């Protein structure tokens, strides 16, 4: 009876903490506008390795993040919801990237997050990496990276400054998250699995909540 009571107490305590965390996230994000950018798409497939297209992985995770964020009351906007590029036919890659930045600007977004999958000549390269605009704070990138790493037990690739178009041209807090390496067979397999994508999405949402707790 004592063991049963103890286990029941642990369960109830876990339930209370989980509920409190969920409620906190809901109240914290209720008035936030968040733009999620699934990198690449359409004529820009991104990295293609081990039979997996980066654009497909990016979109799959982004949709899962959107659904979880929507449950918190946040206004969530995806730059794309299908396998398409954003710029008009005949436009340049820069035009496509600018169109993604413009989505956030038009929406009056609070943060901009671009999701990607990495590639490297070294097939053992692995891990989640958060990129932030050079010369600006790294807190959003760090929160996202930490959330994704804790959610998946992936290799922690740290955070790094970068001059990527969508970062340097964003006027709001922005981060680009490399969710893993498609050139690494083990990570490629994980990134294509629904269960792992769900874990990534959960971690990313927790990272967003952590970011707004400090801002």
Positions of PLM-derived features:
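C-terminal segment of classical bacterial N-terminal signal peptides
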Residues: 16-22
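Catalytic-core regions of hydrolytic enzymes
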Residues: 24-140, 150
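Short, charged, low-complexity patches
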Residues: 58, 137, 141, 193, ...
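Active-site-adjacent substrate-binding region
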Residues: 137-160
């Amino acid at each position: 009876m004592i063991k049963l009571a103890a286990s029941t107490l642990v369960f109830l305590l876990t339930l209370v903490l989980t509920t409190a965390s969920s409620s906190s996230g809901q109240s914290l994000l209720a008035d936030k506008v968040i733009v999620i950018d699934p990198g690449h798409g359409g004529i820009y497939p991104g990295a293609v390795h081990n039979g997996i297209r980066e654009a497909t992985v990016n979109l799959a995770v982004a949709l899962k993040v959107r659904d979880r964020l929507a449950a918190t009351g946040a206004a969530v906007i995806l730059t794309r919801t299908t396998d398409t590029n954003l710029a008009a036919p005949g436009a340049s890659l820069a035009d496509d990237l600018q169109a993604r930045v413009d989505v956030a600007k038009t929406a009056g977004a609070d943060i901009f997050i671009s999701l990607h999958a990495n590639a490297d000549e070294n097939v053992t390269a692995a891990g989640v990496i958060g990129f932030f605009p050079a010369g600006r704070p790294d807190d959003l990138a760090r929160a996202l990276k930490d959330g994704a790493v804790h959610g998946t037990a992936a290799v922690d690739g740290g955070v790094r400054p970068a001059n990527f178009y969508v970062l340097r041209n964003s006027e709001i807090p922005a981060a680009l998250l490399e969710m893993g390496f498609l050139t690494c067979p083990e990570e490629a397999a994980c990134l294509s699995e629904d269960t792992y994508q769900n874990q990534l999405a959960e971690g990313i949402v927790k990272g967003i909540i952590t970011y707004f707790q400090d801002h």
